[in-house]
Amino acid sequence: MDVARTRFVRKQAPIPPYALDVRGLKMSYGNTEVLRGVDLKVAPGEVVALLGPNGAGKTTTIEILEGLRCRTGGKVLVLGTDPECGDERWQARIGMVLQSWGDHRRWSVRTLLAHLTAHYSGLVPSPRGVQNVDQLLEAVGLTAQAHRRIGQLSGGQRRRLDVAIGLVGNPELIFLDEPTTGFDPEARAAFHELIRSIARQRSTAMVLTTHDLTEAELLADSVAILVSGRIVARGTTETIARKHSWGTRVSWREHERLYSKTVSESVPFVRDLSLTKPHIT
């Protein structure tokens, strides 16, 4: 991804009732149906975790919502706009936390962020205004590393830089796809605190994908459980458990082992979800 990709001038639009409104989202690759009617609503300022095992369709869903992949069916409203595939004009008000500094390893952290803020400042990317470099550095805890080359940062520091890049346009909605993959426990805890702090201080809506229930509970106001391309439950883990207390359970295996804390341990309502029981009602 080009960190300096063009963003377009956009007039301030009325605030939509939902930061994200997804209805019947479908995605197929040939005859293989990956998403089979995903429905998801995210209110302004709400943090939602899209929770599910690998292969459930989490990354595909996020890529469609970011405009990086074309859907085959359904309706998507991102901040009130139904984006056309490949059209970046609507992306001026969203943030994507992904590794987007690959060609700039020799740049300092400050140089890269200054370049981005200068690029976006004249384009009015958000009605909330563009962040300055010092604000970004402070927000992600990289003030002390401001003059360090990106290639010299630790893995956790680089991930913080990813967040800073996602915050440049002061977005109203941020997408994070498996944000702590490969982190050790200490780095994971620090990153969790960073995301919670940003959510509290900025009232920014966030959608993050994870297969870790503990992470979802720590970061999100609510979870949406995605299994085999469908949202099978939505709410806090407590409300989901109360609503679906009829005794089935969700669990999944990966690499022949169960996660230390899977959905089955905290949300005892689905057991071995299959195509014969795709929905919970």
Predicted segments with their positions:
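Conserved ABC transporter NBD signature motif
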Residues: G74-C85, W90
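Catalytic Walker B motif of ABC-type/P-loop ATPase nucleotide-binding domains
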Residues: I174-D177
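Conserved ABC ATPase signature
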Residues: R149-L153
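Conserved ABC ATPase "signature" region
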Residues: A114, A118, P125-Q145
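Helix-to-loop junction immediately C-terminal to a conserved catalytic motif
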Residues: E66
